[in-house]
Each structure stands twice: as C-alpha cells, then as structure tokens.
C-alpha cells in the first residue's frame, strides 16, 4: 500500500441543525469548526436532516392517497374505451 494517499479517518460529531442532537461517528470529512462532546473536542459537521429529524425515522411521514389518484385517473379517462380490472 502506498503511504499518505488515504484521507484522514477520524472521529467527527454530526450536529442535526433542526433538533440540535449530536452524533459521534468516524468520517473523512473535514471541518474547521469544533464542538465538545462527552468531555472531548471533536470537529463538527452541521447536517440539515439526520435520522433524528427525518420524517421516515420519526414516524411523522405523510402518506399520499394512492387510491384517490387512481380513481381520479379512471374517472378522467373513462370515456376513452379503457376498462377497469373490476369489470372483467
């Protein structure tokens, strides 16, 4: 392996800008900002969305009405000779 060609892999704190929660992980990303986490200083990376604030992980996700969209489509194009599977 060649020496000094790999990026520096080190502990980094990821900060959720929405909730303020901090996550300690390892990364090659660089930052000039630092923060204290569990008594030690780490580089900090600010994130807009993390698992702490993303709707999928928080359970607050919005579901679309797929059935309503299909019914609307069928009503709109009913006169063009297409048949529903229910009519068979």
From Swiss-Prot:
GO terms for molecular function: structural constituent of ribosome. One of its GO terms (biological process) is translation. One of its GO terms (cellular component) is ribonucleoprotein complex. It holds the Pfam family Ribosomal_L31. Keywords: Ribonucleoprotein, Ribosomal protein. Coiled coil: none annotated. Part of the 50S ribosomal subunit. Belongs to the bacterial ribosomal protein bL31 family. Type B subfamily. This is Large ribosomal subunit protein bL31B. It comes from Leuconostoc citreum (strain KM20). The gene is rpmE2.
């Amino acid at each position: 392996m060649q020496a000094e060609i790999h990026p520096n892999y080190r502990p980094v704190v990821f900060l959720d800008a929405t909730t303020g929660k901090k996550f300690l992980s390892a990364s090659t990303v660089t930052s000039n900002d630092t923060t204290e986490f569990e008594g030690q200083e780490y580089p900090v990376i600010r994130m807009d969305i993390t698992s702490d604030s993303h709707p999928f992980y928080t359970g607050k996700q919005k579901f679309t009405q797929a059935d309503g969209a299909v019914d609307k489509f069928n009503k709109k194009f009913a006169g063009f000779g297409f048949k529903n599977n229910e009519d068979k």
